[in-house]
Amino acid sequence: IDLLARNIRSALSRLESVKVRKVQGRIIVDIDDSDMQEGLERIVRVFGIVSVSPAAVIESRLEVIEQTVEDLVKPLDFRTFRVSARRADKTFPMQSMELARHLGGTVLRAVPDITVDLHDPELNVQVEVREETYVYHETIQGPGGLPVGCSGKTGLLLSGGIDSPVAGYMMAKRGLAPVGIYFHAFPYTSDRAKEKVVSLAKILAGYTGSFKLYVVPFTELQLEIIEKCPERQITILIRRYMARIAEAIAEKEGLGSLTTGESLGQVASQTQESLLVTNEAAHLPVLRPLIGMDKQEIV
């Protein structure tokens, strides 16, 4: 939870007056109303978060809770509801079920022509009583997964296509912090392709909090391979040299693996035999999270 809180702070670092704190298994983010929308957009991309709920933070006094619940429900359009209460602070005089029933009465008195539905309500008013009380009704799904960095770091071989950033996203979701590695071989790869990779790196940074990108000049080596090697071996040799260079970067950065966007049989160079030959050039494990997917699934 410490790492997750740190990742949330990183995601919100550009916003002012943000405070991230841990409260009994929850992470509470105090944020100005003016920054709420942007803050939510950033938080719901942080891996390790299951859900986010914008909440009113109030005193743990019954009359304050009642008034807050009433103010919350009056503007809303609903016909069925329930109140879910959780009393984490055992000094509060009412137990959870008793508080839920009491606040249900508050809602019934505040809004006409509504009924209680405990199983499938249109509105679920949630109240958590701790040292302070949180009142909310909206739950926004997060990406889930593990906090980025808890599983170590991986070298992500970026190409400019959709496959490699999706692979990086998937490994980040399992707690690996990706470090981008892009091989630029002008004129075989254009400057526009490099700009696209930089753009993809920025998008990934929105999920990982930060993203270091290595741009490796590869033209000279690629020309040597093309000039001196049999044509049918060129692609495999290029991939083997990329793997070796990526391993050198991995040693410098303390990476525990390499990640690629390869998918079995998607192109001629991605057969079992070709992947085996590429693997033999690397000592680190090569992770291929897209290996069993086709292009439609990846997109």
Label every model-predicted segment.
Residues G161:
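Conserved G/P- and acidic residue-centered "switch" motifs that form tight phosphate/ATP-binding loops
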Residues A201-K228:
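A conserved beta-strand->alpha-helix junction
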Residues V125, V179-I181, Y214-V216, T259, ...:
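Hydrophobic/aromatic beta-strand patches that form the interior of the parallel beta-sheet core
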Residues I1, V64-E66, D71-L72, V267-T271, ...:
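Proteins with a high burden of low-complexity, intrinsically disordered sequence enriched in S/T/G/P/A and R
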Residues I1-G155, P165-F211:
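RNA-binding accessory domains that recognize and position tRNA/RNA substrates
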Residues H102-V107, D113, P143-S151, F218, ...:
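Active-site adenylate/phosphate-handling loop in enzymes that bind or generate adenylated species
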Residues G39, I43, A167-M171, V216, ...:
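Membrane-targeting and insertion segments and their boundary/processing signals
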